[in-house]
Amino acid sequence: MCGGKQEVFDRVKPILEKMGSSIVLVGPVGSGNMTKLANQIIVAVNIAALSEALVLATKSGVNPENVYKAIRGGLAGSTVMDAKAPMMLDRNFDPGFRIELHIKDLTNAQNASKAVGMELPMTDRVLDMMKKLQEEGLGKCDHAAVLRYYEEQENIEVKR
């Protein structure tokens, strides 16, 4: 997720390739940052949707692990799902990417959207959920703990 001039990108690309596997020049200076914000929106909304679905399954009496296994290979499957569903099912909210950091990124996305006159209703909703969890002392937990927001709303716990 790089922004800048092609000639500069070409010079530093070998160094960047040692730090990551997907090195893409997305546009001029600032484009890399906007791409990072877009990524964080997608991750946050995916985690919230996964949480909502697993709580719905659990509350409906369906085994959430079986739901995950059934849908992970289809269109709803994703890298986010494969990374976060097992954590959710194991009740493992040890930080990989903390809620407090995702709050920062989503706040930056909100600010960027305001600068171009756009609303981000799904981002706003997930950000509110994360802020509530942070207020409850879960800010240092992995963002998979968004599951806890839904669990609290429905007074139910998702687990294997």
Q: Model-found features: residue ranges?
A:
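ATP-dependent carboxylate/acyl-activation modules
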Residues: E17, V158-R160
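Interdomain hinge/lid region at the active-site interface
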Residues: V29, N33, G77-T79, A83-A144, ...
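Internal alpha-helical scaffold of NAD(P)-dependent oxidoreductase catalytic cores
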Residues: M1-T35, V43-S78
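Sequence-level detector for tyrosine residue identity
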Residues: Y68, Y149-Y150
